[in-house]
């Protein structure tokens, strides 16, 4: 369920606040700032296919750890390299892809763990947590940007992603030890 929360949180915060973050980097051109969302969306559309294919071939737990690590790296690099147009495009494409990858990979893990009627209930919970993330993401990251400046856009989401990685890694490790 954590992956759906992360997807909702990162998706809503990044799509909603990206134009605000981008504005100083595009000479206060509102149209150019809004167009940055297109690079984010292109990653959201293209990379989930690759992530789904990888999920069929490799250990999903390790793939989730890799995906989260990429998200953390990208989010910490965004404030540093966003002024470079080629890096901006690459980082936004990757951010969009890993964000949607949380959803794809989370659903595949859910489908492996639950079957039948229980899967229906688990899927409803999955969507519920996604919605909670979508509601919390923009105000939390927006407040961080108010308090700590424009760079908090990437850094705050990076810290949240790091917390998710820690919780995911340690809870999965505990579950595997008990089995």
Language-model-detected regions and their locations in the chain:
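Transmembrane alpha-helical segments of major facilitator superfamily
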Residues: 35-44, 126, 130
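Helix-to-loop junctions at the C-terminal end of transmembrane segments
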Residues: 47-59, 145-146
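A late C-terminal transmembrane helix in Major Facilitator Superfamily
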Residues: 116-147
């Amino acid at each position: 369920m954590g992956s759906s929360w992360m997807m909702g949180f990162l998706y809503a915060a990044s799509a909603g606040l990206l134009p605000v973050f981008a504005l100083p980097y595009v000479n206060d051109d509102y149209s150019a700032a809004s167009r940055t969302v297109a690079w984010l969306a292109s990653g959201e559309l293209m990379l989930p296919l690759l992530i789904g294919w990888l999920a069929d071939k490799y250990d999903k737990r390790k793939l989730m750890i890799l995906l989260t690590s990429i998200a953390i790296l990208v989010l910490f690099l965004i404030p540093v390299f966003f002024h470079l147009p080629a890096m901006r495009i690459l980082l936004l494409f990757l951010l969009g892809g890993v964000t949607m990858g949380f959803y794809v990979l989370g659903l595949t893990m859910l489908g492996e763990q639950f079957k039948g009627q229980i899967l229906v209930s688990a899927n409803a919970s999955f969507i519920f947590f996604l919605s909670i993330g979508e509601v919390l993401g923009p105000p939390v990251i927006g407040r961080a940007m108010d308090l700590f400046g424009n760079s908090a856009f990437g850094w705050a989401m990076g810290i949240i992603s790091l917390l998710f990685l820690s919780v995911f890694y340690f809870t999965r490790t505990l579950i595997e030890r008990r089995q």
